[in-house]
Every structure is written in C-alpha cells, then in structure tokens.
C-alpha cells in the first residue's frame, strides 16, 4: 500500500477536507505553526478518519515559517524539538493514540544532513 502523507495544522484550516484523502499526517507542533488548539483539532480529525498521527517539529521560527536555519544552541534546539514532540504526544495520548512518526519541517529537515547534532535529537 502507498502511504499518502500530508503536513497539516499549519494555519490553513483545511484538515477536515484533506484527512479523508490521506493515510498519515504530520501535525505542526508549535515551532513554525500550530498550537495546542490546532493540535487537538488535527488529532480529533485524524482519529475520525483513521489517519496515522505524526509530529512535524521545526525550528522555533514563526516569522520565517521554520524555513530558515536560525542561530540556536544545540541545547535550545534539543529542548525546543523535544517540547514540540512531547506536546503533540501528550495530546495524542489523551485520546488513547500514539505518535506513528516524526517528520522534520523546513530548515530542520535539510540541515540535518550537515549538522549531526540535529540528527541526534
């Protein structure tokens, strides 16, 4: 089976349209977009549509939508990424669900190729 996957919870409020068409979703967890309310809404819609739930963490950079590498210590970076993932994980858990996957967003997804500390998080 082919997995159809989509980034969601990024402020477009189209999750109810897209979720019935996909198998798994990557939910923005507060770095580049998203907040507790949007994560809750996405988790609820994912559950109704039997969609696997994944975290979509990023640099804490809403101004650039997480698309630019920002100067941040490895400690701050680790803390931010783990906070984002843990936030979504707690919400999913409150509905009896587990995170299926993690898909890095924007600059995090391509800087990991050159920065081993990012990959280790």
Task: Set out the residue ranges of the language-model regions.
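Short, well-ordered coil/turn segments that N-cap beta-strands
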Residues: 2, 23, 49-51, 96-100
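Hydrophobic faces of well-ordered beta-strands that scaffold small-molecule active sites
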Residues: 4-6, 25-27, 53-57, 104
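Active-site beta-loop-alpha junctions enriched in small/polar residues
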Residues: 7-11, 30-32, 58-62, 107
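A short alpha/beta connector and helix-capping loop motif
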Residues: 12-36
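Acidic (Asp/Glu)-rich catalytic clusters
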Residues: 17-20, 42-52
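Glycine/small-residue-rich loop that forms an oxyanion/phosphate-binding "nest" at active or ligand-binding sites
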Residues: 63-94
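N-terminal glycine-rich phosphate/adenylate-binding segment common to multiple enzyme folds
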Residues: 90-94, 100-110
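Single conserved hydrophobic/aromatic residue that forms the stacking wall/gate
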Residues: 112-121
């Amino acid at each position: 089976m082919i997995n159809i996957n989509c980034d969601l919870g990024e402020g477009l409020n189209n999750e109810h349209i897209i979720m019935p068409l996909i198998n798994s979703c990557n939910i923005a967890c507060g770095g580049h977009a998203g907040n507790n309310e949007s994560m809750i809404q996405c988790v609820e819609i994912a559950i109704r549509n039997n969609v696997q739930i994944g975290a979509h963490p990023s640099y804490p950079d809403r101004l650039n939508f997480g698309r630019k590498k920002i100067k941040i210590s490895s400690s701050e970076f680790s803390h931010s990424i783990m906070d984002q993932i843990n936030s979504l994980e707690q919400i999913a858990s409150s509905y009896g669900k587990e995170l299926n996957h993690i898909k890095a967003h924007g600059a995090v997804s391509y800087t990991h190729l050159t920065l081993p500390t990012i990959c280790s998080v």
